[in-house]
């Protein structure tokens, strides 16, 4: 393998919007995510609408019956 062409692969801290943190490996030191396994509806068993940048409101406004 050639030297000095591969990225540095080290431990990275993953931070979720819910506050959960865990360590994995990556080329970046910190990774910020919106949903993790602690708060994702599939893993928690709770129904929850995940709204990113008001997409649900935009859809409801556009297609709601008046």
Curated annotation (Swiss-Prot):
Q: Which cofactor does it need?
A: Zn(2+)
Region forming the signal peptide = none
Keywords carried by this UniProt record: Metal-binding, Ribonucleoprotein, Ribosomal protein, RNA-binding, rRNA-binding, Zinc
Co-factor binding details: Binds 1 zinc ion per subunit.
InterPro entries in UniProt: Ribosomal_bL28/bL31-like_sf, Ribosomal_bL31, Ribosomal_bL31_A, Ribosomal_bL31_sf
A cellular component term (GO) from this record? ribosome
GO molecular function term, any single one: rRNA binding
**GO BP: any one term:** translation
Quote any Pfam family the record assigns: Ribosomal_L31
**Superkingdom of the source species:** Bacteria
Residues noted as binding Zn(2+) in the record, renumbered to the chain: 16, 18, 36, 39
Q: What is stated as this protein's family in its record?
A: Belongs to the bacterial ribosomal protein bL31 family. Type A subfamily.
Q: What does this protein do?
A: Binds the 23S rRNA.
Complexes and interactors: Part of the 50S ribosomal subunit.
Q: What is this protein called?
A: Large ribosomal subunit protein bL31
Give the organism, scientific name. Answer: Thermodesulfovibrio yellowstonii (strain ATCC 51303 / DSM 11347 / YP87)
State the taxonomy lineage: Bacteria, Pseudomonadati, Nitrospirota, Thermodesulfovibrionia, Thermodesulfovibrionales
Q: Which gene encodes it?
A: rpmE
